[in-house]
């Protein structure tokens, strides 16, 4: 039970850690990264792991079920859980909750809830820079899932990095309104490639997997940038790099500390970026010229030292263009 010290009920029995996602675990990016993070915990700790694929209409009932089944810590993966995470935390003060990518403004966060946010724009800035340097057509694309704070960070970071590399680069960005529509991803990617775009950065879940499939089918000259994890294994000749957001590592760090110390640092948001080694890009000497990788290393240092402030939305992007381009 929650006490003033933040101690939690790990004193008796095998701890039970639950992982709740919206969608499926085999999305080859975001949810799968979270799953890999908790699986690594089982190598180090004796825990019971509960995995739950949920959907909007069943969030509350699923979370009640996990609470009643004795979960010590419940992880909620993705911004769609933002509202329900606060609601259940307030209702069940003895429980521990953690959420990845919550969308909270300056509102207070319950003491038994911790949120993890990411400066994904910093990694996307680097891959945008790469795209602009590597593109042969001078036209690159961005394929997003659902428009909003989380995907916008990827989009505007990517666009800013591309413009930083080449102010004349042409960028075409489009959202498909879903993270689970493979066919929509295929359709938009096909159109982009036919319009002369030769590199697409996706942040569209299964839609992005569809885009990778299209790049692979079209072959040489059709390239893609993966997201969250290294996705090069899906199309080794077409995936130039991936903008990484190590959800699994961040989840693992917090849960390990909780299991080792029996303390829970709730009531706040933890923010990770390039500096913490949680976001970044995948090196690929086969497709990224050595001199470009050297430029990226220098650029990373500038971002970490705040010499370059990477935009994360439309407003900050427009400000960035005035300052740096």
UniProtKB/Swiss-Prot annotation:
List the S-diacylglycerol cysteine lipid attachment residues: 4
Record has Signal as a keyword: yes
Q: Entry's SUPFAM superfamilies?
A: Periplasmic binding protein-like I
InterPro entries with a match to the protein in the record: BMP_lipoprotein (IPR050957), Peripla_BP_I (IPR028082), PnrA-like (IPR003760)
Q: Which GO terms describe its cellular component?
A: plasma membrane
Where found? Cell inner membrane
Record's keyword terms, sorted: Cell inner membrane, Cell membrane, Lipoprotein, Membrane, Palmitate, Signal, Transport
Q: Which residues form the signal peptide?
A: 1-3
Alphabetized Gene3D superfamilies for the sequence = 3.40.50.2300
On subunit structure and binding partners, the annotation says:
Monomer.
Biological role stated in the UniProt entry: Immunogenic protein. May be part of an ABC-type nucleoside uptake system involved in the purine salvage pathway.
Q: Which family does it belong to?
A: Belongs to the BMP lipoprotein family.
Q: What is this protein called?
A: Basic membrane protein A
Source organism of this protein record: Borreliella afzelii
């Amino acid at each position: 039970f929650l006490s003033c010290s933040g101690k939690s009920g790990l004193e008796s029995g095998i701890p039970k850690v639950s992982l709740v996602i919206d969608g499926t675990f085999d999305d080859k990016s975001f949810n799968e990264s979270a799953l890999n993070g908790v699986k690594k915990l089982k190598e180090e700790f004796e825990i019971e792991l509960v995995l739950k694929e949920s959907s909007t209409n069943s969030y509350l009932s699923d979370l009640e079920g996990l609470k009643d089944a004795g979960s010590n810590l419940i992880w909620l993966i993705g911004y769609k859980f933002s509202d329900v995470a606060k609601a259940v935390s307030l209702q069940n003060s003895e429980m521990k909750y953690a959420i990845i990518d919550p969308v909270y403004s300056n509102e207070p966060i319950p003491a038994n809830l911790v949120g993890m946010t990411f400066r994904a724009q910093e990694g996307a800035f680097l891959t945008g820079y790469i795209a602009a340097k590597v593109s042969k057509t001078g036209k690159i694309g961005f394929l997003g899932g659902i428009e909003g704070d989380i995907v916008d960070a990827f989009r505007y970071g990517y666009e800013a990095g591309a413009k930083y590399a080449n102010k004349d680069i042409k960028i075409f960005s489009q959202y498909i309104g879903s993270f689970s529509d493979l066919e929509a991803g295929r359709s938009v990617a096909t159109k982009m490639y036919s319009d002369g775009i030769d590199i697409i950065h996706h942040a569209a879940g299964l839609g992005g997997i569809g885009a990778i499939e299209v790049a692979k089918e079209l072959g040489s000259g059709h390239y893609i940038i993966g997201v969250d994890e290294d996705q090069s294994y899906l199309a080794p000749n077409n995936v130039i790099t991936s903008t990484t957001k190590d959800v699994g590592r961040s989840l693992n760090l917090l849960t390990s500390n909780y299991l080792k110390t029996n303390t829970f640092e709730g009531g706040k948001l933890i923010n990770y970026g390039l500096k913490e080694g949680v976001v970044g890009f995948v090196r690929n000497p086969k497709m990224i010229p050595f001199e470009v990788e050297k430029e990226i290393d220098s650029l990373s240092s500038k971002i970490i030292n705040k010499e370059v402030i990477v935009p994360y939305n439309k407003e900050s992007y427009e400000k960035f263009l005035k300052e740096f381009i």
